[in-house]
Swiss-Prot record:
Family: Belongs to the UPF0227 family.
Pfam families noted in UniProt: UPF0227
Name of the protein this chain belongs to: UPF0227 protein Sbal223_1944
Organism: Shewanella baltica (strain OS223)
HAMAP family, per the entry: UPF0227 (MF_01047)
Length: 179
């Protein structure tokens, strides 16, 4: 089972395409949607929804995959549920870069402060990151340096921020899920 968490653009047709591509790894791909506008509510909703979905699966190695803001949540929700995560062009600092896009971006800082202290140290090797060299949204070199002590980092020379084509990375994602 793969949980797919969309980015800030929840209605992008690319989300369906990424889910279809992920079905080459596991036919059971589930979209876990969230508002993107209310971080505290989103966190509670995602925790409940993932726990509910996991009760109805016998997959020994479920995986969370998120793009952009979805990767922010995939890392945290995955950690809190003991799941591996794939973070694609993760938005690591929505409290800074979501100003003007959502009502209360400061809630992300509050979530970070309330999360398990040093959770990345406790989550080491339980996530893999895929970064676009040509990400038009974020400085991925900086973000990769924040995560490289904890997670493996893969680079893509072709894909933009929304990462419409996962094909080149599907074998690594599958190996990570099954390892």
């Amino acid at each position: 089972m793969i949980f797919y968490l969309h980015g800030f653009d929840a209605t992008s047709p690319g989300n369906h395409e990424k889910m279809r591509q992920l079905q080459f790894i596991d036919p059971d791909v589930r979209l876990v949607s969230y508002s993107t506008l209310h971080p505290k509510h989103d966190m509670q909703h995602l925790l409940k929804e993932v726990a509910k979905q996991m009760k109805h699966s016998d997959d020994p190695s479920p995986l969370m995959v998120g793009v952009g803001l979805g990767a922010y949540w995939a890392e945290r929700i995955g950690f809190l549920n003991g799941l591996k995560s794939v973070l694609i062009n993760p938005n690591l600092h929505p409290e800074e870069n979501m100003q003007g896009k959502i009502d209360r971006p400061e809630e992300y800082a509050d979530i970070a402060n309330k999360c398990v202290s040093q959770f990345r140290e406790k989550n080491t090797h339980k996530a893999m990151c895929i970064f676009s060299v040509n990400d038009e949204m974020f400085d991925n070199q900086q973000l990769a340096s924040e995560l490289s002590a904890y997670y493996s980092i893969d680079w893509d020379d072709v894909q933009p921020h929304k990462f419409p084509q996962l094909a080149a990375h599907l074998p690594k994602i599958k190996a990570f899920k099954l390892a």
